[in-house]
Amino acid sequence: MRISTLLSYAGGFREAAEEVAELEKAGLDVVWVPEAYSFDAPSAMGYLAARTERLTIASGIMPVYSRTPTLLAMTAAGVDYLSDGRCMLGIGASGPQVVEGFHGVPYQAPVGRIRETIEICRRVWRREKLEYQGKYYEMPLSANRGTGLGKALKLINHPVRDEVPITVAALGPKSVEMTAELADGWLPAFYLPEGADAIWGEALRAGAAKRDPARAPLEVFSGGAVAIGEGLEAQRDRARPQIALYVGGMGAKEKNFYNRIF
């Protein structure tokens, strides 16, 4: 078991980084750096790489719609270099409220895009000349979609590792199945052990059946909220706004997987 913590995307980062450095001394194993529509995660991850020595620095998460797969791979390789092999690339689809509302990009085919992103990232880290013909991504871009002058290039720098671990934030059945098949880790939101099998069990088993046996078993980062303080009701009151944000504010009214979890 590894112990991790998630930074707030709305708090003061310098103060949080100091706290993370102290938590590392106490035994913290992983720190998740969120992004949403706040400051970008990689800037904070690079800063944490300089302020820590041992713990894993994970993006939690970067949307696949806000960057090309190759830029995600380049960024993860850069943070991995700065941290001497301590980066974990956490990716996900986010949601249409952020992707279309903040980035102005159509929220289309999230499962397929994440699948192709994983495949492309691993090719980049192996420093292959990148030639990829997917449904959503094409490298080099063909003449009928671009100028036809694109070249198959490989990453200039040598990454610290042949692969940076990829963790996927997934909630829907198809996304969870794809994660269990391809990813190194799974980051579910509001994981409730007593209901996990009913919600995700079938998808996890279906994905595991297609998983490459040479790849290590899927690591599950099933964190729960922990409040430290006096009085049970007071701590519940502290948790209510965050839960209400996701249950009531994230996702459309008619299609909200967070609501299904609860």
Question: What are the residue ranges of the model-derived segments?
Answer:
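N-terminal beta1-alpha1-beta2 module of alpha/beta enzyme domains
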Residues: 1-59, 65, 164
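N-terminal small/glycine-rich loop or linker at the start of catalytic domains
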Residues: 1-8, 58, 96-99, 138-163, ...
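Hydrophobic faces of well-ordered beta-strands that scaffold small-molecule active sites
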Residues: 3-7, 31-33, 57-60, 87-91, ...
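Short, acidic/polar
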Residues: 11-22, 75, 170-178
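Conserved, mostly hydrophobic/aromatic
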Residues: 27, 48, 79, 121, ...
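Active-site-adjacent beta->alpha loops and helix N-cap segments on the catalytic face
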Residues: 39-46, 192-207
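Glycine-rich anion/phosphate-binding loops
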Residues: 65-78, 108
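An alpha-helical appendage that flanks or caps ligand/catalytic pockets
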Residues: 108-155, 197-262
